[in-house]
């Protein structure tokens, strides 16, 4: 039996969105779910205990970054990421593919793998499907991702086709190299850029490899929202209904809701932590740039409808003061609130699916948030 399994609980009659539960060796989590990103074995500014307080059920960490610092051997010696960072709930690690391919001029792609230079010190390294499986095995996450090539946007058809075909061959090599199947589940990643024919081909080829879960990669890389939704419209239905469906690197409120409507179960993004550190907060009435002068005497809470620790205890004026002064507490408070906002949003999405009202919820949320469909 696979280490990670999916249980479908309900399908929304209004939209077709899925309410489910993913079971892992470190516990279960309800879906659709947003996963906070802990790139270097930490969600920036948040302790594991604080993540539990905001009800984060699963977090993501990054293979590329943990391989470079502190190194897979140190993490393995600590008992994997769970022991190293004192987190006893599920963890997902990406394969590092996106980071390696983002290095652009610092890397070279061959059929064997990718040769790249560290962004830290320029040292030379090689990632192959086999070496990435070895690293992810040592990191010890419950869900590990196959090593894939993420094509840029825009990209020519011929380039994307070759890239997608290589990703499929690498996925097969990853599956052959992954032996720790009782403790970890390996997910395949559907690629193909913005080309329908290639997405369909990728999905069908990966389904033949029978992974315990599937992800859609190569989206939210600069394409317009309507193109991303179009790709989801024809790709998500091709993914097995009895396995988790993961949309990689997506985390704005509208993307989360639209992804759920299209049958996606799992999402991750650095957005809430990154914009939080820059002084932007997510609220039920849209984004608030808290460093703006107009909030200097605003003693109301960040979001009038939020009951998180930050909103219960601190004002906009105080948080603006902290951010303007470069105080670490300010960055922690905005990060805390933003993560809570998205985790709570997904709770509302799950309830709306249960009530068969997700489309209605979307319309009400968009109206208040300031989105247009």
UniProtKB/Swiss-Prot annotation:
Annotated substrate binding sites: 94-98, 148, 191, 218
Binding note for cofactor: Binds 1 zinc ion per subunit.
GO terms (BP aspect): queuosine biosynthetic process; tRNA wobble guanine modification; tRNA-guanine transglycosylation
Keyword tRNA processing: yes
Pfam families xrefs: TGT (PF01702)
EC number of this enzyme: 2.4.2.29
Chain intervals for the UniProt region annotation (RNA binding): 249-255, 273-277
UniProt keyword terms in alphabetical order: Glycosyltransferase, Metal-binding, Queuosine biosynthesis, Transferase, tRNA processing, Zinc
Top-rank lineage group of the source organism: Bacteria
Catalysed reaction equations from the record: 7-aminomethyl-7-carbaguanine + guanosine(34) in tRNA = 7-aminomethyl-7-carbaguanosine(34) in tRNA + guanine
Pathway: tRNA modification; tRNA-queuosine biosynthesis
Catalytic residues of the enzyme: 94 (proton acceptor), 268 (nucleophile)
InterPro entries per UniProt: ArchSynthase1/Queuine_TRR, TGT, TGT-like_sf, tRNA_ribo_trans-like
Binding site for Zn(2+): 306, 308, 311, 337
Entry annotated with the keyword Transferase: yes
Function: Catalyzes the base-exchange of a guanine (G) residue with the queuine precursor 7-aminomethyl-7-deazaguanine (PreQ1) at position 34 (anticodon wobble position) in tRNAs with GU(N) anticodons (tRNA-Asp, -Asn, -His and -Tyr). Catalysis occurs through a double-displacement mechanism. The nucleophile active site attacks the C1' of nucleotide 34 to detach the guanine base from the RNA, forming a covalent enzyme-RNA intermediate. The proton acceptor active site deprotonates the incoming PreQ1, allowing a nucleophilic attack on the C1' of the ribose to form the product.
Family designation: Belongs to the queuine tRNA-ribosyltransferase family.
NCBIfam families, per database record: Q_tRNA_tgt, tgt_general
PANTHER family referenced in this protein's UniProt entry, alphabetically: QUEUINE TRNA-RIBOSYLTRANSFERASE
Protein name: Queuine tRNA-ribosyltransferase
Organism (species): Ruminiclostridium cellulolyticum (strain ATCC 35319 / DSM 5812 / JCM 6584 / H10)
Gene name of this polypeptide: tgt
